Amino acid sequence: MRFELERSETEKLIVESSNYKGHDLVALRIYFLSKEEEWLPTKKGVTFRRDQLDEVLGFLNQIKSE
């Protein structure tokens, strides 16, 4: 599963769910458009276990409510 949010013409945030070595993960990472017109990941991002998602969403909902 994948979600993309364009930040500019050359940058976007990609949210992905994946499985690595038996662990269900969620990754949020900034991608940039290379000179070769290919979207590549940057070092800017975070990956966490899917079982931590409720905590992250709870905090984001608190921010949204402010």
What are these regions (language model features)?
Residues 1-8:
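Negatively charged, low-complexity tracts enriched in Asp/Glu with abundant Ser/Thr
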Residues 12-13, 24, 54, 61:
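Residue-level marker of intrinsically disordered, low-complexity segments enriched
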Residues 13-44:
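A short, structured beta-strand/loop element
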Residues 44-66:
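Mixed-charge, Lys/Arg-enriched low-complexity segments
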